C-alpha cells in the first residue's frame, strides 16, 4: 500500500482569516493525525487512515494514499444522484468547519466514483477561529449525533497528544456553535436540513 509521509512542524505569527485574528498558527503533521482521529469519532470516514510514524529519523504522519478517479469537481460525468453528491459536499463542509481547515481547495478534495469526498491535507487546520467561512445549513445525522455525545474529556483523551490547548478549545467552541445551528433547524422543523450518513 502506498502512503504519504508528512513531517512539517512550522509555527507562524499574526494570522488572520475572514476578519478573525490569532497570535499564531501551526502547519503541523500532528493535525493530520488529529483530523483522522476526529473523523472516526464522528463516523464520517472521509479522511484516509493516518497514523504517527518515525521515518528517516523524523516523526510525522503517515497517510494511506487515496486512489480516486475524480480529483476535481469538473472532472468526469455528472453524478447519478445529484442530491446525494450535494449532501457529500455538505458533510465535508461540516467537517472542515469543525477542524477549521483554511487550506481546503479544489486540488485537495478528492472524489470517489460515487462523488463521496476523500479529505486530505489537514496540516493547516485547528485554528481557534469561530466564524463560519462557508454556509452551514445541511447536516449529516449520524455525525451530528456523535458530535452531541462528544465532550471535552473525550476530545482531550483522543486528540490531546496532537492538539494544543487553544486548538482543542477552538474545536469545542465551534462544536457549540454548530450544535446551536442544529438545534435551531430542529426547532424550526427543517427536516430537509438533515441527511442520512
Show the residue positions of the predicted features.
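Soluble non-cytosolic domains of exported or imported proteins
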Residues: 26-30, 83-84, 88, 165
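C-terminal catalytic region of ATP-dependent kinase domains
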Residues: 24, 112-197
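Active-site acidic catalytic loop and adjacent metal/ATP-binding pocket
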Residues: 5, 87-125, 171
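Glycine-rich loops and low-complexity Gly/Arg-rich segments
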Residues: 72-75, 86-88, 142-146
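Short intrinsically disordered coil segments
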Residues: 76-82, 134-139
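A short secondary-structure junction signal
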Residues: 73-77, 104-109, 130-131
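Low-complexity, flexible helical/coil segments
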Residues: 41, 84-85, 98-100, 146, ...
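Conserved ATP-binding subdomain of kinase catalytic cores across diverse folds
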Residues: 1-80, 93-101, 113
